[in-house]
Amino acid sequence: TTGWAYYDESKEDAWNRSVEMMRKVCDYAKANDILVAIEALQPNESVLANSVEQLKAYLDAVNHPQLKVCIDFGAMARVNNTIQDYFDAFGKDVIHTHFVDGKPTGHLAWSDGTRDLKQDLLDLEANGYDGYLSLESVNSRYYEKPWEAEEKTLSAFDQLETK
């Protein structure tokens, strides 16, 4: 992620520090033949990149071929961005997805939120996405029984196959 600003630090200083550090991370990644995927965060998680527009500005500032994009469905929904917004801005640089349900946010298991699972999959497919879908169900409701989130998500996928 882009990180956060220190409480006594300007957003500009935090941005510059983050960009400089991300270039170092990407240089290391290049030397080891790996890619780095970065996500926008929700406004309560970071002050640096919360939207497609801000994430695009960040990637432009870092300007490194190893830096790619992860769509986080929670952050995306929080600022009313769409899957299509991400592909319009980043195209094939979208290499990973935190594929979760939400109301509109919440990092919920599929079927616990209000997102349209089938339509989201169709939108990814329409854009030629062939990357991974990480199930990032990190809501406190799953802390005691985390497997329930996976079971709900698998059930939601199974229901798609029977329709």
What are these regions (language model features)?
Residues 39-41, 74, 138:
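Short loop/turn motifs enriched for small/polar and acidic residues
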Residues 49-70, 77-163:
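Histidine-acidic metal/acid-base catalytic patches
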Residues 1-69, 78:
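Active-site acidic/histidine proton-transfer and metal-coordination neighborhood
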